[in-house]
Curated annotation (Swiss-Prot):
Topological category with respect to the lipid bilayer: Single-pass membrane protein
Protein name: Single-pass membrane and coiled-coil domain-containing protein 4 homolog
Taxon lineage: Eukaryota, Metazoa, Ecdysozoa, Arthropoda, Hexapoda
Membrane-traversing stretches: 31-51
A cellular-component GO term for this protein: membrane
Recorded coiled-coil stretches: 8-33
Subcellular location field: Membrane
Protein keywords: Coiled coil, Membrane, Transmembrane, Transmembrane helix
Native organism: Anopheles gambiae
PANTHER family to which the protein is assigned, alphabetical: SINGLE-PASS MEMBRANE AND COILED-COIL DOMAIN-CONTAINING PROTEIN 4
Length: 60
């Protein structure tokens, strides 16, 4: 069994199960919140670079 931080007591089955559930919850949040946010930021950067580097044609 795993020792908890700062103490001599060991982790119980219930604590281990709760820890695993928390880890799964965090991974799910990663997929639903963090990755789409990074995607939007990346897309904004791509659009900004595209708009700043496109050739401009001056009308006569």
């Amino acid at each position: 069994m795993r020792k908890l931080r700062g103490g001599q007591t060991k982790e119980t089955r219930k604590q281990r199960q709760e820890r695993k559930e928390e880890n799964l919850k965090i991974q799910q949040q990663m997929k639903t919140i963090v990755l789409p946010t990074i995607g939007v930021i990346f897309l904004c950067i791509v659009v900004y670079v595209f708009l700043k580097t496109r050739p401009r044609y001056e009308e006569l």
